[in-house]
């Protein structure tokens, strides 16, 4: 066997060893359908994947959460699309497929890191050390006491716990893709050929469309990488031009799955998802300037070191600063900064491996071998503890015994109305078991911010407030909620949102109970239709100042409660189109209780009519005609989505054409006689 073949075999065996190590740790996850951690947000991802599997040809509008939302806004959809595809191809449930896909991403993470460090250092053993540390040592638990307490021991695997207990499957998957994306970028910059350009653009697009934290982490890894290349023999403007072109191409490819309006929604919600991060936006320019100055200073101090060593230090510094400033000092440089501790673990693994390689590279072979053997021996106990922890963590649950499943099952068989609002974890999991639409699902996908304003009020109002229940019911009716679930102190629902769990007793009719503390109430007695005929002067024309300001809602809700008004029949014709039939008088219009989006269009009796937005973010149509009216509504995403599809398609065609030309040129060069 040639030396080159031997090297390839050694590389493959080391990569396989890392994969098998992680498989050893989390192997049960490949077989599990449902885990017992119902507070995990993975229920929402399973629900979206379930919807995808049932609507492959119609993924435009998602009507099941947040009063309806564009499909790309539900969540970066690549992982959910992959889960639905795996479930269909393998003939397994969506929940099983979700765990199978995320387990695979977990096992491939250290393999991807191995490939990246191998590319940067040209050392298989440095790459193996990076992958080994990333697989078996949770450095965030050693650096952040709260994480160690959450795990139970700093020796336990944080990456696995975050993925399984909290539902960080998309985040963990995006880190795997991020590592591969930087590898592809390094190849593309070095080779400057179309095939590598295509791979890099695809890898970055895949990262961004898997998880929003992963999308922002692209910036956090590319900036240190590019800065490390500066120097007398480093990058020129052409290299930066290639980098910019790859970034533009990646976004153009991803644009239909993350259009500008979706990014704007994310920015709006990120200010208050998981905490108050408005200060991070206000101080963003200041922190950005400070960080760039710090990176430049570190770069200057290390200017004589190899670029890969500079990158390792710069990347580890940046990720540690972001995660630890939040964990230690509660300084959020970016929204949800502490969640970047998973990227920090990867960065520190790179740093340790690269520094060790630099220190031992010129040492005798026996010293390098002894150092590696010492590391392997030292990691035996942590690996065994990881496995013991995983064995206790990765256990199945009878899903039909959970309150989340029972609630959704009753909605499937006992509920004949429209939109509902379930509490806490039942809302996370509702889409996994049911097609009944809900007011909420999770905060990141809310396009109508008034929903979040109202939710804060009806969950957190002081029980002593005299109109607490009545005002909450006004909000419910305004947003088309026809049933509401409440979880009391004895409920098994994870995260019980209502401060006053008795606020609806005697006010609303209970229609389902499970034990003493889980109850669903009916809201109002009106029809289930999403379209309602109301007088023009009843439209909500003034935005409430806050969640307790319900006076602007009163005329609108009074019209909704007025059963003498004409009935409007709303019927979905596809997942993104509907028909409304109603008889209108000249002073009446149609209120459609879905979140407004500019991508909706309508015709009234065949003539175009605008779809307008009221003061609480819902749609209304004012055809200004009397008598029988047939309204046809269609969602196509509007000009933005049409442009996004065209741009993405043209970018893909250009990249494929460049790939073909490059491949043909290379083939002709090989055939040309010397």
Where are these regions (language model features)?
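Start-transfer (signal-anchor) and selected internal transmembrane alpha helices
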Residues: 1-29, 373-374, 653-674
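Membrane-interface helix-loop-helix junctions at transmembrane boundaries of multi-pass membrane enzymes
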Residues: 2-5, 192-193, 232-243, 294-320, ...
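Membrane-interface transmembrane helices that cradle and orient dolichyl/undecaprenyl
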Residues: 173-174, 178-196, 232-233
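Signature aromatic-anchored transmembrane alpha helix within multi-pass, membrane-resident enzymes
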Residues: 245-251, 357-384, 673-674
